[in-house]
Swiss-Prot record:
Binding residues for GTP: 166-173, 191-195, 212-215, 279-282, 308-310
Name of the molecule in the record: GTPase Obg
Source taxonomy: Bacteria, Pseudomonadati, Pseudomonadota, Alphaproteobacteria, Rickettsiales
Residue span, Obg domain: 1-159
Species this chain originates from: Orientia tsutsugamushi (strain Ikeda)
Family recorded in the similarity comment: Belongs to the TRAFAC class OBG-HflX-like GTPase superfamily. OBG GTPase family.
Amino acid sequence: MQFIDEAKIFIKGGNGGDGCVSFRREKFVPNGGPDGGNGGRGGDIIFIGDRHLNTLINFKFKQHFLAQNGRAGAGNNRTGKSGQNLVLKVPVGTQILSNNKEHVIFDLTKDGQEFIIIRGGKGGLGNTYFKSSINQKPRKNTVGEIGDSMWVWLHLKLLSDVGLVGLPNAGKSTFLSAITSAKPKIADYPFTTLTPNLGVVYINNNSFVVADIPGLIAGAHLGQGLGDKFLKHIERCRIIVHLLDITAENLLQNYYTIRDELSSYSLSLKDKTEILCFTKTDTQSNEVIMSKLLELQPVINRVIYPISSYTKYGIKKLLANILSELQKS
């Protein structure tokens, strides 16, 4: 299924039904009083978070969503039927933004969470309502209210515990497939991953969700490559796992490229707990691995975990550390 994480839609509550002008007409009661009923309410627009959804594709090809109108009132003081509410299911993690994108109206972060964004219009009043001691036969009624309407943006930010970051071809998708049952596309060329992938890690009777986003390049926060579109998906992550390809020529520069992009995009990303690891260590000798660890660790003042997604070397230790950090946060 195509991954869509942004959509602009028009939503409108149902109109209220009109009130009715009616008078009793029964045998032997030639001058019956008013009996016009009120109109029914218009339907509401309701958003619901659904954990079984992971894309906004349902809003790509249909842009207008209208709740049902209320029915008009009827004689014998019958109130019109209310319009049905329109329920719009969206993935958990969906934000509803104003038309100018400057205001977050609501953030659906839980499965089953509901938000009534628009109320339907009230039903109009029938002529029974206007009967008084000085007006026994009112011919007055009111029309139903027009339902509110607005344009809104839907932004999906995936909910995960761990976000994987790194340059293109750093081994993120291979790592995800090694630790979860996720099956992302894997190939030996940059930008194999074009959409975020999610997987669940099970360890020591615990579990956590890992998100793999497309590789970042310098200038990602300005729209270079694919990064600026997908960086938002790791904003909600509790910790970041930064993968460095040990076969790359300039490891220090590669490290700072990613750190600079995270910092430039959001201060919240800059300050998140980061776990750093070397990938593809099965391609290097122990001497080379140790040399690169000694070269880089003192400079960045970080522990680096050497791993191989192919042989599973170092994976168990890394996952245990990730779980420990999650339990602290």
